[in-house]
Design a protein with these regions (language model features):
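Bacterial N-terminal signal peptides
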Residues: 1-11
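Gram-negative and organellar
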Residues: 13-345
């Protein structure tokens, strides 16, 4: 792969392309251990500053028919207080895609690997996990007159999720994802407005072991308008049906996103999402869960591009549980100042 990167940097065929990205930032996290706010796990949230970094790269080959893409990402967090050193984490991700173009369609085989390595911590505060997914994806785009477009994706994978602290939370099984979208262009061909519509669905069958089986179903849609600013409204409904008592639930996820450009090359993104969950009393949200997927969310992001691919950004995220969730009260706030670099060829 390093040889291919050399070709890319110092003179390569037009069919080769690649990207490099690097981030470094300082952040404050009010709840690094992601524990309930009421101390029900025997520990209360304790904030800490941290430094974080990310490196990622991708290399793609596009021939007359063949398509190939390799990607790698590594990221990590190091907390600056001794009490939160056990939340230090290093993450590695690898991706591989190989497929063929048939007309306006693409058929691709995919492999995705994710592994997190957390510092030693009590088992109830560990959240590192490993996942592997392999399968195939079909996608197609049909351009229409006037700048309109229809596109679709169908992705079937087999997935393995290994929760390292507790094998009973690990599962294996198939997953099917489908998405249908379209773009409607209005006004001037170059300066007009775009309306993007999409609907999506996902179904998983998860085998947790000899006694537990879950069926997870998610459906939703979004509409986005992009002109002088971007406005997106979305909604998802999720149902988890489990053979284990207390693990079934349903939730509704309305979302609103707003992005715009201020004078001085300042890009602003705001997002809010509610997690309206209904379940039997006693449902727990494992701390290894991703907050963006399992909590109500408020986000504010400011980014200022700099010359030669650099940028500086600031981001606030707040994660909350709602009283109607039927789960332990939860709050987490993060504030990040980040420097980034992007290169593409």
């Amino acid at each position: 792969m390093f040889g291919l990167w050399g070709l890319l940097l110092f003179g390569s065929p037009a069919v080769l392309s690649g990207t490099v990205a690097a981030d470094a930032g300082i952040e404050y996290d009010s709840n690094p251990a992601r524990v309930p706010s009421d101390g029900s796990l025997g520990v209360l949230p304790q904030g800490s500053p941290l430094v974080r970094g990310l490196w990622s790269g991708s290399l793609a080959y596009a021939g007359p028919k063949q398509r190939l893409r390799l990607s790698a990402t590594t990221t990590g967090k190091v907390f600056l207080t001794s009490e939160q050193q056990q939340q230090n984490v290093l993450v590695a991700q690898l991706g591989y895609e190989h497929g063929a173009k048939i007309g306006r369609s693409l058929i691709v085989g995919t492999i995705d690997y994710y592994d997190a390595f957390q510092a030693d911590a009590p088992q109830y505060l560990e959240r590192d996990f490993r996942s592997l997914a392999a399968g195939g994806r079909f996608q197609s785009v049909r351009p229409l007159e006037g700048g309109h477009r229809i596109d679709g994706v169908l992705h079937l994978t087999g997935q393995l999720f290994h929760y390292k602290p507790d094998p009973l939370q690990s599962f294996v099984g198939p997953s099917l994802f489908a998405k249908l979208g379209g773009r409607v262009h209005a006004g001037d061909p170059e300066l007009g407005h775009d309306f993007d519509l999409s609907v999506h669905g996902r179904g998983d069958y998860r085998i947790y072991g000899p006694v537990r089986r879950d069926v997870f179903v998610s459906v939703g849609g979004s509409i986005q308008w992009q002109g002088p600013l971007l406005i997106q409204v979305g909604y998802s409904a999720q149902v988890n049906l489990s053979s284990t008592e207390l693990e079934s639930y349903q939730r509704h996820l309305p979302m609103l996103k707003l992005a715009f450009h201020l004078p001085g090359e300042l890009f602003v993104t705001m997002k809010g999402q509610l997690n309206l969950q209904k379940s039997a009393l006693g449902l727990t949200v494992p701390i290894q869960s991703i907050d963006e997927d399992n909590r109500s969310l408020v986000l504010l992001d400011l980014e200022r591009p700099l010359p030669k691919g650099f940028a500086i950004s600031a981001r606030y995220c707040g994660y909350f549980s709602l009283p109607a969730d039927g789960t332990s009260p939860y709050q987490r706030h993060t504030a990040l100042l980040n420097f980034s670099y992007r290169f593409a060829r």
